[in-house]
Amino acid sequence: LNAPDRHTLLDYLLSRPLILEHQDALLVHAGIPPQWSISDAVQNAELVHQQLRTNNPEKFLSKMYDNEPSSYSDKLSNEEKCRYTINALMRMRFCKSNGELEFNHKLNIDQTPVGFKAWFFHANRILKDKDIFFGHWSTLKGFNIEHIYPMDHGCVWGEKLSAFRLIDRTLISQESIEGN
């Protein structure tokens, strides 16, 4: 939040949803906790947007980067619910089936921390039949599981920038101009 154009950036981000639903697809930065339905995810994302619109956004955001709470509960304060929601939708890779988040590992999927799984591997995941497009995990390139579309193909690391055209279900990729 120290960028000289932070107010312009914040205004833009305030206008963007944390989760986007289009036809039978969901778009999210990192993932959706396995215990959440679409309405849970949208409702909690809207709570974050309400807080951003009604409070000082810079002050609110300064309280959001923390690893706690690592689990969601209706008993959490609104601030804690917002922090969990931001962490889940924006930072999550590994979690437990109850949605307990793990942030210490940024590893490939075959290096899962003990007791955790990739958020989309949980057998009890509610959104099994919904296409979910997400980024945030460049080591998943080439990964294939039904209804799960990891879209971070490592452009920032000199690899590919990718997009998915929903109308004809086409993946479009462009090599990074930086190269490896």
What are these regions (language model features)?
Residues 12, 19, 27, 88, ...:
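Conserved hydrophobic/aromatic beta-strand scaffold that supports enzyme active sites
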Residues 65-141:
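Alpha/beta-hydrolase fold catalytic core
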